[in-house]
């Protein structure tokens, strides 16, 4: 929907589908994404990141996201703590992305959480 502060598209029906899955008996809501993408310079960039850049648009609150799927698996997020959610997301990140709990802690403690978009 946005790249940083630049608006790219509208919200569409994402919230309608998430709300329907959330409220229906036995319903399950999935966000399906590619784990990574190639940047213009050819480098691999993870789509699973520890933070989003300031000013980015967020369509759905985290409380509405039940599951996220990539080509490396499904992260079931319902009822989990923030740390458990992060660990579940790291588990479905691209294996070459360098995502790990220890790398995220290190980046956070050294204030090196630059998210290149």
Task: Give a label for each model feature.
Residues 1-117:
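Conserved phosphate- and dinucleotide-binding cores of soluble alpha/beta proteins
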């Amino acid at each position: 929907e946005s790249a940083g502060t630049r608006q790219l598209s509208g919200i569409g029906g994402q919230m309608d589908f998430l709300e329907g899955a959330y409220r229906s008996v036995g319903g399950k809501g999935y966000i399906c994404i590619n784990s990574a993408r190639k940047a213009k310079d050819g480098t691999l960039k993870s789509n699973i990141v520890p933070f989003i850049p300031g000013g980015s648009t967020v369509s759905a609150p985290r409380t509405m996201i039940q599951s996220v799927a990539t080509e490396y698996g499904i992260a079931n997020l319902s009822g989990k703590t923030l740390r458990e959610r992060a660990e579940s997301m790291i588990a479905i990140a691209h294996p070459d992305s360098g995502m790990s709990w220890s790398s995220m802690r290190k980046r956070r403690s050294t204030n090196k959480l630059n998210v290149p978009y």
